[in-house]
A protein has these predicted regions:
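Short, flexible helix-loop junctions that flank or precede catalytic/ligand sites
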Residues: 1-355
Length: 355
């Protein structure tokens, strides 16, 4: 039998190497994602099935093991001492166990530390409405939302309810009262928790992910009733985010949803993590603010015009992804080559580079 490395040693390696993720899979050594690239843990052996099982079972309790074996996959999170938390997706592949572990640092960074535009701080001051933070997996959505919630928590006397699967960043009540509910442990589903949320006297509700019609409908209702709602979507732009929310509804409901969204939507931050010169990654974001022009576009179903409105909306704090990338190149933070890799429109990027 192969001697498995201790899971604690691998978790310490994640933190030491400033990795974002650890991957465990039969037939490979433990793999780290460092600055966006996968690299093997130095001097680690290739893992066999027993080694992977030992590593994964070391971070599961008995109930969690049974869920994983029954359902074939399982999401959970756990604290690793004072060093951070890990969000885990354990699953089966080709008949063997495997897992992806993402590091969630204990320290919650500020909007400034994340490199996000100044206007993003104002999202925490909205009295009501819907704010979306969007992007692909691993784009820093949870980190940005944690920064906004932390700002509210330490500056305002609000009742904040988060509904997450699983809980990532943990918030200790400060000026605000923070309630964090984890799907499968504290509630059966996002939709069930959202139905209860309105009876819990919230000021702010965070929805970890809007995955289906019922969750999106609940988010709209909560925002319409005078609360501030933060939520995430796996979309790459403001226009795509709006279309995604509307398209989950049957055609006969879509005009009504457009009207509701046009009234409650406050802002969308669509972000990616871009490798910096040297090491590390920085958030690059498209920012949409719901001006009267934006609300009309949503109401009339003309989201194809959204990019143009964002490009000309700098006075309101809006900026396109390409403009953000150019600013980062000019600041010496990222290379022009990386900017091209993440550009929405390379011709537009080059035009902006020329000034």
């Amino acid at each position: 039998m192969q001697a498995a490395p201790k899971i604690e040693i691998l978790l310490e390696e994640v933190i030491k190497k400033k990795a974002s993720d650890l991957h465990l899979q039969v037939g490979l050594p433990p793999m780290l994602r460092v600055d966006g690239a996968l690299v093997p843990v130095a001097s680690a052996d290739v893992l066999n099935d027993e080694a992977v099982e030992t590593l994964i079972f070391a971070i599961l309790d008995e109930d969690q093991k049974q869920i994983l074996l029954k359902d074939k996959e399982f999401d959970f999170s756990f604290a690793f001492g004072d060093l951070g938390r890990f969000r885990v997706n354990a699953f089966h592949e080709r008949g063997n166990l495997a897992a992806a572990l993402r590091l969630i640092p204990n320290e919650i960074l500020t909007v400034e530390q994340l490199g996000l535009p100044e206007v993003v701080k104002k999202f925490a001051d909205y009295p009501r409405g819907l704010v979306l933070v969007t992007g692909p997996t691993g784009s820093g959505k949870s980190t940005s939302l944690a920064a906004l919630l932390h700002k509210i928590n330490v500056e305002q006397g609000k009742h904040i309810i988060t509904i997450e699967d699983p809980i990532e960043y943990t918030h200790t009540s400060s000026k605000s009262v923070v309630v964090q509910r984890e799907v499968h442990y504290d509630t059966y589903s996002f939709s069930a928790a959202l139905r209860s949320a309105l009876r819990q006297d919230p000021d702010v509700v965070l929805i970890g992910e809007m995955r289906d019609l019922e969750t999106i409908a609940s988010a709209i209702t909560i925002a319409e009733t005078g609360h501030l709602v933060f939520a995430t979507l796996h979309t790459n732009s403001a226009a795509q985010s709006i279309d995604r929310m509307i398209d989950v509804f049957p055609p006969h409901q879509q005009p009504q949803i457009r009207s509701q969204l046009s009234n409650i939507l406050m802002a969308i931050c669509s972000q990616r993590l871009v490798p910096m010169i040297g090491s590390g990654r920085i958030a690059a974001a498209e920012i949409m603010i719901a001006t009267p022009a934006v609300r009309n576009i949503i109401r009339e179903g003309k989201t194809h015009q959204m990019d143009a409105v964002i490009q000309t909306g700098a006075e309101f704090g809006m900026q396109s992804m390409d403009r953000t990338l150019v600013n980062l190149v000019h600041a010496g933070t990222i290379s022009y080559e990386e900017a091209r890799n993440y550009a929405v429109d390379i011709d537009e990027l080059d035009r902006l580079m020329r000034g």
